[in-house]
Amino acid sequence: MINKEKTFNLATFFCLYIAQTIPMSFFSTVIPVMMRQENFTLSAIGLLQLIKLPWIVKFLWSPIVDRHTATTGDYKRWIFSSELIYAILIFSVAMLDFKADFYTILTLIIISFVASATQDIATDALAVLAFSRKDKSMVNSMQSMGSFGGSMVGSGVLLLLFHQIGWNSLLPCLAVFVLVMLLPLFFNKGIQITPKLPQQRAKKADVLYFFTQRSIWKQIGFLFLYYSGLIGTLAMVRPWLVDLGYSVQEIGMMSGVAGTFV
């Protein structure tokens, strides 16, 4: 039986995961649709996937986060500061016009994805350290629920709201939502970890060892090909629906709500 403290801890991590996913899913969905409506080429829309690059290369600065965290408070500071930047950037995008400030919007979104990726680094590390081995499956389920739930809301429900209230009204609400999702972590005093002892830094030889392990390139190749096909297909589905004459509301229902369940 799960006690109240553990339930609160799991709910706290669910809030963190869904807070990072909803805005990212929304931007990744609505911008290709808006670009196609403005007659951008499919090549340009395909290149838009590069805005997700911070999440792909976040391993480059994850050692920095890990090196400067030893206590629960350290992890919380990384999470709070990252999410605050995330919310500020989302709010800033709301003040801009999509047509007139397109490249500024893209720049701010990329920076916001850096912030959300940094939050994810700290959140994952805290989750690993705060839960025992037998409870890690439960916090992993919170991560999955936050990811799929955030995808459904961000690429589905918010697209429906976007159709009703527009860009400039929706994004400030989204920024506030990100901050509200930090409240459980702020009030949660039950998440405790054993302070880490100073450890030896990874050397070039350690990195080289990882990439020279037996069969490692087969695994990397499989992941690369699997996700390349999946992401490439999804990137073109929504612009294709625009070409077929579907409205933003219909695309949100089909691609976001129904598509997530499938």
Regions found by a protein language model. Give the residues of each.
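Juxtamembrane intracellular "pre-TM" segments in multi-pass secondary transporters
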Residues: 1-7, 190-221
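Helix-loop boundary and gating motifs at the non-cytosolic
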Residues: 2-55, 217-241, 247, 252
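Transmembrane alpha-helices of Major Facilitator/SLC transporters
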Residues: 54-63, 253-262
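Glycine-rich segments within core transmembrane alpha-helices of 12-TM secondary carriers
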Residues: 55-58, 137-162
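Transmembrane alpha-helix termini and helix-breaking/packing motifs in multi-pass membrane transporters
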Residues: 63-68, 94, 151-169
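C-terminal ends and interior cores of transmembrane alpha-helices
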Residues: 80-100
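Symmetry-related core transmembrane helices of the 12-TM Major Facilitator Superfamily/SLC fold
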Residues: 81-87, 168-187
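Cytoplasmic helix-loop-helix junction between adjacent transmembrane helices
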Residues: 110-146
